[in-house]
Amino acid sequence: MPQNRWKYPDGSVTIKLYEPFPAGESLLLKLEDKTMDYNKAALEMHETHKGKVGIVSKVEVATRDDLSTAYTPGVAEPCRKIKENPEDVYKYTFKGNMVAVVSNGTAVLGLGDIGPEAGLPVMEGKAVLFKEFGGVDAFPICIDAHDAASVIAACKAIAPTFGGINLEDIKSPECFEIEETLERELDIPVFHDDQHGTAIVVTAALINALRVVNKKMEDVHIVLNGPGAAGTAIIKMLMTAGAKDIIAVDQFGTLYKGCNSAEAHKNWLGEVTNPRQIKGGLKEALEGADVFIGVSKPGILTTELCKTMNKDAIVFAMANPTPEIMPDEAKAGGVRVMATGRSDFPNQVNNVLCFPGLFKGALSVRARDINNEMKLAAAYAIADLITDADRSEENIIPGAFDPRVAEAVANAVAKAARETGVARL
């Protein structure tokens, strides 16, 4: 076996990031060198290894006995056992630790609708992160399906093979129907990371930001700019966490009762948010606000707008690669706590803090679903890793490489699954 392919101590299938650097050196750490040309490095890495993932056998097939045990005739016996008791598929196959990363490539971050083939490198990367950060095996599946019904049918067809499904880079509003239908019709966890992974990490960061400024979730006035898939999930998650005063703002202005949006989810948001029924644009929404959360576009928030916010304002500007406002501009406007989606600024809101541990926890108890209680448990598990002594304006969330994160999230999610009755173990 080549040295850059190895088995994990637990013997699980290895989907491993191959290293084009000398043994023992981490590619991920090398890529943190700011002087490196990421585009050039990525092309070289992908071409050299023909992608980033592969399958490594858990067993050795070196003799006739090995062959007869791993394949015919011996393999017939586990097949018979599973036929007698379908739950034994978890006992005799990789299903219990295998996630499908499913995408149709219609909403790839920063690239848009690029199709399934062009989206494959991203899905390979997601599989790498599942394994590297959570020890969860994941397989990228890019499908040529654009309408919701076709994506749903494809996911249902492959579901018997997998312990969970991670939906990725599927455009709105189709993503809502796809996830809701699969959650209802499948008995394995289905999770759209672009929605809920973002929402969980944002909630974790906000929990700690509010601790820094000594405010409570139920008391603060929150403005969210960009109520698409991620923005809508963030609002739902914050409401689950206790937020009561949220205003959503899209390109046409605030959402309110009777706003008559062309998008159904925005009409729903207009009904359940904006308790004071504020009408207008971002300027009107931000007056006296405690928190701004942006999942929208670069430069939409200005220093002058920040000055209209409440004292000790919190700004999460998560448009990538250029945020809604740069940290120095926000600070000039009186913002006290600032977070972005970028690794070169403090307080990076990064989904990798969530999905590896969340699936690890859900799979460990064979959860049928990932419910709100499990999501909120994940958010608090992430937030609580920052102690009172360490918490500050520039340290409200763990770093992506914090080795404690996945295990803490997994334990919290598994506990919540058992407490809410969706665990089978």
Sequence positions of predicted segments:
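Short, positively charged and aromatic/hydrophobic N-terminal segments
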Residues: 3, 8, 14-32
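N-terminal ligand-binding/catalytic initiation module
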Residues: 10, 29-190, 410, 416, ...
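Rossmann-like adenosine-cofactor binding region
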Residues: 267-336, 342-344
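Solvent-exposed alpha-helices and their adjacent loops that cap or buttress functional pockets
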Residues: 90-95, 131-132, 157-159, 183-184, ...
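General beta-strand structural signal in soluble alpha/beta enzymes
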Residues: 140, 166-169, 190-193, 224, ...
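Adenosine-phosphate binding glycine-rich loop
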Residues: 193-194, 213, 317-425
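Glycine-rich phosphate/diphosphate-binding loop of Rossmann-like nucleotide-binding domains
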Residues: 109, 114-134, 186, 192, ...
